[in-house]
Amino acid sequence: MTVVEISTDGTLTKTTLGQDVLQEQKVQHLVKAGTWFGSFPNNGTTYSFVGCTVAPGFDFCDFQLGSRSKLIDEYPQHFKDIEMLTEGLP
């Protein structure tokens, strides 16, 4: 699975999760607060089994589902990634 992040300064980072650390895969990954993120299965796989733990605690007041149009307006340089990760969203 690959995690795609857009930080508050607009930097896009892709992190590949997996067991092969010699191929720079990571077995776990931390996404910082305030970062937009999404993920997709790697080539050759059709799904990923994922868990997401939040700390110190989760409050829906702090949650915001990304809007395709708003994200593209804010980060037009990442149009292709945003479009792929927000399929089916307005």
Where would I find each of the regions flagged by the language model?
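Short linear sequence motif anchored by a di-proline
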Residues: 1-90
